[in-house]
Amino acid sequence: MDSFELVVDAISFAYGKGQPNIFSELSFSVKAGDALALLGRNGVGKSTLLSCLMCFNHVQKGHIYCNGVDLISASIKERAKLIAFVPQIIGADIAYTVRDYTSFGATLRTGMFSSPSKEELEKTDAIMEMLGITALRHKPCRDLSGGQRQLVAIGCALLQDTRLLLMDEPTSALDIRNQVIVLETIEQLRAQGYAIIFTTHLPEQALLLNSRVGLCRGGSIDFYDSVSDVTLEALEAVYKTKLSLFYSDTVNRTVCVIPQLGQKGM
């Protein structure tokens, strides 16, 4: 894949005039092959930041550049060629088949009511094969498990043919097996050169992916180039809870973060 960079330049956002900023003067960047995990408690602005990057929410200050294109002033169609969004999970009542829903991602680049071309349908089939959902191609999405629906949502985003994927709590409400499937897919995409930003409440998911980390405190984000640079004290300050880290000699790194019981927080 070619070179790629997202640059977030001193953005500030509040939900209304006179309201406190969710974040202020926030700057960071991600490049091809980066996975950035945004960690933090509920309500600290993780999902809000993704919404600002997608321009669903409009920042009051700053700029967001994707390969030199200012996303804030770009058209919806221009943004759809640069950045793709994977929601927490697609609706359980979606009647589209897996193949139809996955191929919908291609129409976001060309027009909401356009039909996918033969080439785009061939790419749909290739992406379903990569994600291991080919056998489900004729099945309605509403009949899928949560993990299967999440893979379909990732497939739809990949059909946009962008270099940047934003994933909001991609493993929320999934059992352990399906969490592993989704996390392995994220790692596979990162290795292929995609830039990925995902939100999570769970530090161990960043540990598994050995990703970059942004600790969201509410109003600010502390960035680390490696999850190994994040200290126990920093995690406890973010989650306001005493934690225990478990180290694995097999992989030579911390693999699990568990809260200590018997305390109501710091």
Regions found by a protein language model. Give the residues of each.
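Catalytic Walker B motif of ABC-type/P-loop ATPase nucleotide-binding domains
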Residues: L165-E169
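Conserved ABC ATPase "signature" region
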Residues: S103, K118-L136
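Helix-to-loop junction immediately C-terminal to a conserved catalytic motif
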Residues: M54
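Conserved ABC ATPase signature
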Residues: P140-L144
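The feature captures the beta-strand-to-loop junction immediately N-terminal to the Walker
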Residues: L39-R41
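ABC ATPase nucleotide-binding domains
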Residues: L232-E233, V238-M266
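Conserved ABC transporter NBD signature motif
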Residues: G62-D70, R79
